[in-house]
């Protein structure tokens, strides 16, 4: 009896210790406390809450693969738990993370050579989260993040299209521009995609398609001015594509259940 009481006290103290460390943003130490709590008391009073908070702690400690693995484990163990939406949400965020500095470096590099797969994975994971939990308290932020990711994916396709144009691979450029219009609609890149189509069709002699896309551009983007296609100030691109979603994001901890 006394041993059982002692074990419960140890469990409670470990969890309290983890909470203090999380509150103080000492994420490395919090991870140690939460991992210890989970391993020593896998079926204890705080086990499921600790598992959810561990996802958060890994994420805040920039251990994004560990955050995704922990989220997937939580989903598999607790498919109907009140925190399962949180696990899906963090899993999506952890697939592709950055800040304003990284975003700027992204645009400093050759977009046609960048690995866009993490952004695509994040977009797909967040899409799954929203399809499962459209009314989740985390849904609003997930939708904002998906707008940002859609813009980033569209910019990548435009970068590849321009890469092809520089090498006179106009069919490839047309394919990338069409992909933006058909699969990544309603982004700031749509007029640039149309502009690329107009230029490519003009070069290869497809006058009818050139005129059709020019008319679409004029009707839908009357204020758009194309100067040598995509000659833009870098800060302007960052502001247009990020919608202020970069930097300063406050990712919430899972609520106590």
Describe these PLM feature segments.
Residues 1-257:
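Acidic, polar-rich low-complexity tracts and alpha-helical solenoid repeat scaffolds
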